[in-house]
């Protein structure tokens, strides 16, 4: 199994205009990538009364403890006035060594890093103890009603245990780990 390139994957993710709550196909794209790595996947769509439905993705490889989960989101805020951008927000580019595009910082690059790290791990560890999972929501930038909390509740009902979780959210300026 060959390691996925995190920069290439981040660019592919940025091309999806996944403005909350519309996923624009990004969940199916990630699902296909993860299935190729051997993950069992489930797209979970939740709709709370009075809110737009949101797609989330749960992917897991392995069935034993401990379960190490990566958690994050692929939804983005609207790009605003396109004329204010120096590049097209959904056509990723590299400028002065930085990846530019809507969602590059928050948080499609983190999702790409998660998936490429898992692919690198799997390329060196054919058999490992435990499980690796990803919880990817499409409801962090908006009301955050039909996302992470609902997926965690779903997992609890199925007796899925999360032993460790790495959240790649880069944007809380005040306190590390305070937000997702």
Regions of interest found by a model, annotated:
Residues 109-116, 123-180:
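Fold-level recognition of mixed alpha/beta catalytic cores in primary-metabolism enzymes, strongest
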Residues 97-113:
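Glycine/serine-rich anion-binding loops at beta->alpha junctions
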Residues 92, 100-102, 133-137:
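Short glycine/serine-rich loop segments
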Residues 19, 74, 103-105, 140, ...:
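Gly/Ser/Thr-rich beta-alpha loop segments that engage phosphate groups in nucleotides
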Residues 1, 36, 171, 175:
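Metal-dependent amide/peptide-bond hydrolase catalytic core
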Residues 2-100, 124-128:
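Acidic/His- and Gly-rich active-site-bordering loop/insert found
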């Amino acid at each position: 199994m060959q390691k996925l390139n995190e920069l290439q994957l981040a660019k592919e993710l940025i091309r999806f205009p996944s403005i909350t709550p519309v996923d624009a196909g990004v969940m199916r794209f990630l699902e296909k990538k993860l299935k190729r790595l051997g993950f069992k996947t489930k797209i979970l769509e939740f709709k709370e009364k009075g809110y737009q439905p949101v797609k989330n993705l749960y992917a897991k490889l392995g069935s034993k403890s401990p379960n190490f989960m990566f958690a994050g989101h692929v939804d983005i805020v609207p790009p605003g006035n396109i004329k204010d951008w120096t590049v097209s927000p959904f056509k990723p580019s590299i400028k002065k060594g930085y990846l530019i595009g809507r969602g590059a910082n928050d948080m499609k690059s983190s999702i790409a890093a998660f998936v490429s790290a898992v692919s690198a791990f799997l390329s060196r560890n054919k058999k490992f103890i435990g499980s690796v999972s990803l919880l990817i929501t499409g409801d962090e930038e908006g009301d955050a009603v039909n996302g992470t909390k609902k997926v965690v509740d779903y997992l609890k009902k199925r007796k899925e245990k999360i032993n460790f979780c790495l959240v790649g959210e880069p944007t809380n300026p005040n306190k590390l780990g305070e937000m997702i």
